[in-house]
């Protein structure tokens, strides 16, 4: 019996990756023509290029976007939780991540086994952090909570997640 | 022994004294009660009565509703409310599905078992699978059963798991990691998340994942 109907709680995004937060900003994510809703299924072939993300807010506010996969390498054995795919900081409000500073270049989802969740988290920055942030040593074993705590980003302001699984090599007849 | 045979045929309720006792009840049973009669007969002189009226012996008497008090414990026992249904093996058959909790999944029993075995194998292998809601809710029981077997960890349980899961490596991996992962959790090792229906036939789909 679901204790909550919030899709982020049901999908255990809040819990595995994030803490409970109140969304204060709007973020709409598009992979090509497809709009991302919580829990929708995306094929890795459509996610090769970074998505178009529209962030609400004033242009004097700065935002940070992080995309992680908590189910790496497999949801039954997430040894490398989380695998970070993309980090962009200093995004001015009301624009998209191309106007920010890309700390970690975008890597497309490549789930080897099982169905993985890919979470896009948006934080509001209190101050520009462009110079302090460095690329994490490896993409594996990333912790979004620790990243937010390290740069004093606080709780997220918006989150969306989607599922992806490995596409079959040959088309099903 | 003639006395024990006759006492086996005595009916408890058509005595004048209306003595209900366990020994008199047992004496009405057809077979095994005769072993206990030596002890009970010493306590209750009533059971030593020879039968006077025996045509109300509760044997099969067609489809007429038999007095339920006379037929307790016999294989032809019919329920109070519908005395006209045919009963076999002690199970009741009703026209409606009331109280039947086994999901049939539109398959005969052998196929159903094979489907559930395959689904639990794949869930234990991949950690999260997408399937129809009926199948997801049907397989919860069997996934929990496999994880409980792994929690126990003995050789017998391992062999039982090997008899159910289709792939050996999955069983061995399961037995290796379950004590760490599910040691404190009591039951409820899966989670079902409903999702959008399937395009081809609008079947309601769900993700089922290991918690």
UniProtKB/Swiss-Prot annotation, chain A:
Q: Which InterPro entries match?
A: PEBP, PEBP-like_sf, PEBP_euk, Phosphatidylethanolamine-bd_CS
Q: Which domain of life is it from?
A: Eukaryota
Induction of its expression:
By abscisic acid.
What CDD domains does UniProt report for this protein, alphabetically?
A: PEBP_euk
Q: Report the GO terms under cellular component.
A: cytoplasm; nucleus
Location in the cell = Cytoplasm
> Which GO terms are recorded in the biological process aspect for this UniProt protein?
abscisic acid-activated signaling pathway; positive regulation of seed germination; response to abscisic acid
Q: What tissues contain this protein?
A: Expressed in gametophytes and developing seeds.
Q: Which residues are modified to N-acetylalanine?
A: 2
Keywords from UniProt, A to Z, are: Abscisic acid signaling pathway, Acetylation, Cytoplasm
* Coiled coil regions in record: none
Please give one Pfam family short name.
PBP
Q: What happens when the gene is disrupted?
A: No visible phenotype under normal growth conditions, but mutant seeds show hypersensitivity to ABA during seed germination.
Do you know which PROSITE patterns this protein is assigned to? PBP
Task: Give the family from UniProt.
Answer: Belongs to the phosphatidylethanolamine-binding protein family.
Cite the PANTHER family for this sequence.
Answer: PHOSPHATIDYLETHANOLAMINE-BINDING PROTEIN (PTHR11362), PHOSPHATIDYLETHANOLAMINE-BINDING PROTEIN 4 (PTHR11362:SF82)
Report the function annotation for this chain. May form complexes with phosphorylated ligands by interfering with kinases and their effectors. Regulates seed germination via the abscisic acid (ABA) and gibberellic acid (GA)signaling pathways. During seed germination, MFT expression is directly repressed by ABI3 or promoted by ABI5 in the ABA signaling pathway. Involved in a negative feedback regulation of ABA signaling. Promotes embryo growth by direct repression of ABI5. In the GA signaling pathway, MFT expression is promoted by the DELLA protein RGL2 during seed germination.
What's the protein here called?
Protein MOTHER of FT and TFL1
Q: Which organism is it from?
A: Arabidopsis thaliana (Mouse-ear cress)
Q: Which gene encodes it?
A: MFT
């Amino acid at each position: 019996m679901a204790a909550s109907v919030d899709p982020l709680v049901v999908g255990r995004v809040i819990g595995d990756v994030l803490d409970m937060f109140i969304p204060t900003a709007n973020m709409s994510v598009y992979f090509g023509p497809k709009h991302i809703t919580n829990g929708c299924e995306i094929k890795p072939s459509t996610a090769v290029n970074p998505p178009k993300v529209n962030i609400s807010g004033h242009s004097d506010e700065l935002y940070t976007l992080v995309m992680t996969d908590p189910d790496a390498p497999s949801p039954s054995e997430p040894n490398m939780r989380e695998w970070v795919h993309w980090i962009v900081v200093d995004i001015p409000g009301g624009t998209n991540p191309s106007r920010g500073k890309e700390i970690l270049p975008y890597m497309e989802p490549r789930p080897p086994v099982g169905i993985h969740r890919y979470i896009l988290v948006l934080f509001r920055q209190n101050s520009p952090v462009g110079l302090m942030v460095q690329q994490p040593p490896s993409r594996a074993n990333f912790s979004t909570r620790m990243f937010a705590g390290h740069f004093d980003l606080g709780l997220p302001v918006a989150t969306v997640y989607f599922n992806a699984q490995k596409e079959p090599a040959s088309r099903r007849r | 022994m003639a006395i024990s045979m006759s006492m086996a045929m005595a009916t408890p309720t058509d005595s004048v004294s209306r003595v209900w006792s366990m020994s008199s009840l047992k004496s009405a049973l057809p077979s095994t009660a005769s072993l206990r009669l030596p002890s009970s007969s010493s306590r209750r002189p009533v059971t030593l009565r020879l039968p006077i009226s025996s045509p109300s012996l509760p044997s099969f008497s067609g489809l007429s509703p038999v007095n339920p008090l006379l037929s307790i414990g016999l294989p032809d026992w019919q329920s109070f409310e519908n005395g006209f249904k045919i009963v076999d093996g002690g199970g009741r058959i009703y026209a409606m599905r009331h109280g039947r909790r086994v999901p049939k999944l539109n398959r005969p029993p052998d196929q159903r078992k094979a489907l559930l075995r395959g689904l639990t194998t794949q869930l234990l292998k991949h950690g999260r699978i997408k399937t129809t809601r009926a199948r997801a809710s049907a397989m919860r029981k069997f996934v929990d059963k496999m994880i409980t077997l792994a929690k126990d960890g003995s050789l017998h349980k391992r062999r039982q798991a090997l008899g159910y899961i289709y792939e050996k490596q999955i069983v061995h991996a399961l037995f290796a990691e379950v004590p760490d992962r599910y040691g404190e959790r009591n039951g409820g090792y899966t989670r079902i998340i409903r999702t959008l229906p399937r395009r081809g036939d609008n079947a309601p789909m769900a993700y089922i994942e290991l918690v």
